[in-house]
Amino acid sequence: MAPRDADSLIMPRVLPLRPPEPPEMQARAMDNLRFIRETMAAAATFTAVSGWGTMLIGLTALVATALAASTGSTPRWVFIWMCEAVLSVGISIYTMMLKARANGLPLWSEPARKIVFSFAPPMAVGALLTLVCYEHRLLGLLPGVWMLLYGVGVVAAGTFSVRIVPVMGVAFMAVGTVALFAPPSWTTACMAAGFGGLHLYFGALIARRHGG
C-alpha cells in the first residue's frame, strides 16, 4: 500500500457548508408558528375566574339586599344596587388579577378579551333598561331584568371560561324569570337568592374545582 500523504493525516476534511434557507421558506415557517400560537390561544379557556371573589360578591349582595329592603325610598333602593354593581365589578377584577398572578397566567389574554366583549353588551343593555324602568316607574321589573341580562352575559362570557360558569348563567336566567313574574313581595327574596345565593354556591364550586 502506498503511504498516505502527511497533510492528509493532519488536516481535517472540510465539508461544504449547507446553503442557507431561502427567505421565503423562513417567512413561511414564522407564519406557521404564529398561526399555531394564535390557534392555541383562541382555543384556550380563561381559568382565572376566582371562586373566592365570586363568593365575596355573593356576601356583598346579601348586605345590599338587607340595606335595600330596609329603605323606604325608591331612589335609595336603586342607588344601593348600583353601588353593589360597581363594587362587584371591582371585586371580580381584583380577585381575577390575584388568581392570575398566583398561577402565572396572563390576565389580558385572548380568552379574557372574548369574555369582556361577550359580557359587556348585556350589561350595557341592563344599564339602559334601568334608566327606562326608573323613568317610567317600572321598578318592579328591575330584579327580573337585571338577573336575566346578567345571566345572558355570564352564559356568553362563560363559553370562554371553565364549564361551570355558563351553568351559573343559566341559573341566574331561571331566577330572573321567576322574579319577572313574581309578586312585588318576592323582590327581596329573589334578589337574595339570585345575586346572593347563586354567587355563594357557584363561587364555592369554582373555588373547590378550579383552585381558588
PLM region descriptions:
Residues 107-111, 115-168:
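Membrane-proximal helix-loop-helix units in multi-pass membrane proteins
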Residues 58-68, 88-92, 123-127, 147-150, ...:
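Helical transmembrane-bundle signal
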Residues 156-212:
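Terminal transmembrane helical module of multi-pass membrane proteins
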Residues 41-42, 92-110, 152-160, 202-210:
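C-terminal ends of transmembrane helices
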